[in-house]
């Protein structure tokens, strides 16, 4: 136990150093120096734009540059990824100019079991060039219609679980039960916080979902049963290293997107600490951390 605590303190120290720095090069240097395998990290760290729901697109882009993170799960919040085609085109141009990769959109909601409504969502994502739709609420009854558009557009659907309060999709295992016999491009976005709050083992869920895991929302909780206990990653009880190990074992190719929902008006200290901690964990596993997390 003492050895584990010492290691945890060591990694947290790396996160604290990162929190005190402001340039991308210095942020990358905050990861603990350990012997490496010489292999680049197979874990791609990204950001869920909901984190910056109180900030404009330009402000978010500036913050992402400071964080050394260029992978984005964008949501139609503020002006991050507007649904209006002309405004969306400008947003895409801004991200491209900043070398930010839009890899997913959402959470996107599907309140209507109607072709026109569902097609509009897929067209929106097609214009953005994303390969994954993080879906908040498709009903079991609407899934066959959604599946039709998945096949037409070749865009994957990752249903996002929302914990004990969600009547349909409490945990990834609830999602898996209903999609396991559908098109393989229909799967899960595992929100680790919401998953833990249902009493589901996050690591076991990753293994169970397997190839139907298309996106990850990372966060940490001081109490794994309490939604309001969110803290910076590394300051809570989330088994971050075990999560990364499970993803690597399963050859997960998607992004691990930090969704930092607290301190909406001042998220940067917690984000800086969280990314430094996660990079420190990966470095402690022997991986080379790339200069930019794409």
State the predicted function of each range.
Residues 2-44, 54-68, 124, 169-172, ...:
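Histidine-acidic metal/acid-base catalytic patches
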Residues 70-156, 166, 194:
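Structural motif corresponding to the early beta-alpha repeats
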Residues 43-48, 72-74, 102-107, 133-135, ...:
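Hydrophobic faces of well-ordered beta-strands that scaffold small-molecule active sites
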Residues 158-167, 174-176:
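Conserved anion-binding
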Residues 48-52, 75-79, 107-110, 138, ...:
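Active-site beta-loop-alpha junctions enriched in small/polar residues
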């Amino acid at each position: 136990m003492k050895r584990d605590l010492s290691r945890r303190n060591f990694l947290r120290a790396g996160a604290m150093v990162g929190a005190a720095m402001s340039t991308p090069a210095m942020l990358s240097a905050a990861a603990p120096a350990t012997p490496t395998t010489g292999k680049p990290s197979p874990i791609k760290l990204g950001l869920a734009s909901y984190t910056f729901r109180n900030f404009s697109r330009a402000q978010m882009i500036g913050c992402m540059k400071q964080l050394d993170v260029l992978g984005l799960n964008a949501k139609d919040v503020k002006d991050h990824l507007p649904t209006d085609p002309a405004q969306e085109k400008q947003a895409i141009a801004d991200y491209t100019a900043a070398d930010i990769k839009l890899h997913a959109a959402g959470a996107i909601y599907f309140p209507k079991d109607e072709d026109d409504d569902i097609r509009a969502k897929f067209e929106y994502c097609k214009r953005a060039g994303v390969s994954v739709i993080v879906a908040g609420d498709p009903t079991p009854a609407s899934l066959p219609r959604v599946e039709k558009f998945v096949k037409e557009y070749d865009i994957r659907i990752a249903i996002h679980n929302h914990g004990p309060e969600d009547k349909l999709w409490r945990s990834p295992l609830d999602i898996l039960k209903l999609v396991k016999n559908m098109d393989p491009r229909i799967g899960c976005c595992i929100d680790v916080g919401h998953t833990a709050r249902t009493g589901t083992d996050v690591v076991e869920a990753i293994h169970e979902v397997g190839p139907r895991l298309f996106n990850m929302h990372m966060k940490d909780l001081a109490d794994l049963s309490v939604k309001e206990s969110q803290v910076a990653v590394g300051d809570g009880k989330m088994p971050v290293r075990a999560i990364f190990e499970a993803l690597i074992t399963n050859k997960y190719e998607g992004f691990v997107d930090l969704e930092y929902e607290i301190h909406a008006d001042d998220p940067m200290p917690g984000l800086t600490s969280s990314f430094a901690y996660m990079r420190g964990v990966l470095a402690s596993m022997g991986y080379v951390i790339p200069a930019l997390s794409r």
